[in-house]
């Protein structure tokens, strides 16, 4: 399976802001399967994107010992999120969840949840996609994350 994720927030990091994330699920050959979106308050765009990726990991992560089944490919336009889950979290875990600047990583609850699932042997193939560059499904999840289109509308258009 292939997934596109995006997170968004208006008033990023400010009190009583509005944010959300969107996910689109596709078959391996790119056919639309489903869409999902969730709205939040008092959040950040990074937190929402991490939540989207974590949701895919928890619902579609593949056990490594099932080598007959390739991990789902997950596209995100957030370098922060891709680097966090593909690289940085391993260093932070070795340092008792302290970054090189001696600070605790932001969104540690989400990062630890992903890491724990990873350590149980679950995997996704998380890849960076360039944002706001005309990539069809990345544009759709951006609209889901910002609330500019509903899950129902996406399902009606592409389902």
Question: Predicted segments — roles?
Answer:
Residues 1-47, 51, 58-63, 142, ...:
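RNase H-like nuclease fold core
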């Amino acid at each position: 399976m292939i997934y596109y994720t995006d997170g968004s927030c208006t008033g990023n990091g400010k009190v009583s802001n509005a944010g959300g994330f969107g996910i689109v699920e596709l078959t391996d050959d790119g056919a639309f399967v489903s869409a999902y979106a969730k709205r939040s308050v008092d959040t950040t765009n990074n937190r929402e994107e991490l939540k989207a990726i974590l949701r895919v990991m928890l619902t579609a992560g593949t056990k490594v010992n099932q080598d007959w089944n390739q991990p789902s490919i997950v596209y995100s336009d957030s370098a922060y999120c891709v680097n966090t889950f593909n690289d940085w979290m391993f260093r932070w875990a070795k340092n008792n969840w302290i970054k090189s600047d001696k600070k605790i990583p932001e969104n540690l609850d989400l990062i630890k949840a992903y890491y724990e699932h990873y350590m149980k042997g679950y995997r996704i193939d998380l890849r960076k996609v360039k944002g706001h560059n005309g990539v069809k499904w990345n544009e759709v999840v951006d609209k889901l994350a910002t609330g500019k289109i509903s899950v129902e509308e996406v399902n009606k258009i592409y389902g």
